[in-house]
């Protein structure tokens, strides 16, 4: 299966599994905010010519399988997406109308791993992560 994309002089296929958390790992990504944030993240990715191939927002972290053109560093794209999405959240959910500075929605940092032949396994992991977390939580009730 050939999923290569192209720029003017480059053929590429660069996929990454990204994970990051809200500040203090607060469980805030649910309900309306979760739905809204999904749309915002996809739009922000498009602005950097990226495509979110798979994504899932858990209550306390975000998972994303994303295709990023080689002209952008992964850190640039993640910084852009986290920074701009925090501004969107501040304006839409916390009523901030002016410049949003001094407060943070996301924690610093993120986890990234490259995706190659294991793409289907990564997609499955992202899709089933919430169900697995619930199963583990249920098991911990009986300890």
Which residues does each predicted region cover?
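Basic nucleic-acid-binding interfaces
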Residues: 1-143
């Amino acid at each position: 299966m050939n999923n290569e994309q192209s720029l003017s002089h480059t053929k590429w296929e660069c996929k990454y599994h990204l994970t990051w958390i809200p500040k203090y790992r607060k469980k805030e990504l649910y309900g309306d905010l979760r739905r809204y944030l999904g749309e915002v993240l996809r739009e922000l990715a498009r602005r950097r010519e990226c495509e979110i191939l798979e994504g899932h927002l858990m209550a306390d972290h975000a998972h994303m399988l994303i295709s990023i053109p080689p002209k952008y560093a992964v850190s640039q794209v993640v910084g852009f997406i986290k920074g701009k999405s925090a501004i969107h959240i501040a304006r839409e959910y916390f009523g901030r109308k002016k410049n949003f500075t001094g407060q943070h929605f996301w924690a610093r940092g993120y986890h990234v791993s490259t995706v190659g032949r294991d793409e289907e396994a990564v997609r499955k992991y992202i899709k089933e992560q919430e169900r697995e977390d619930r199963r583990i939580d249920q098991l911990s009730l009986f300890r």
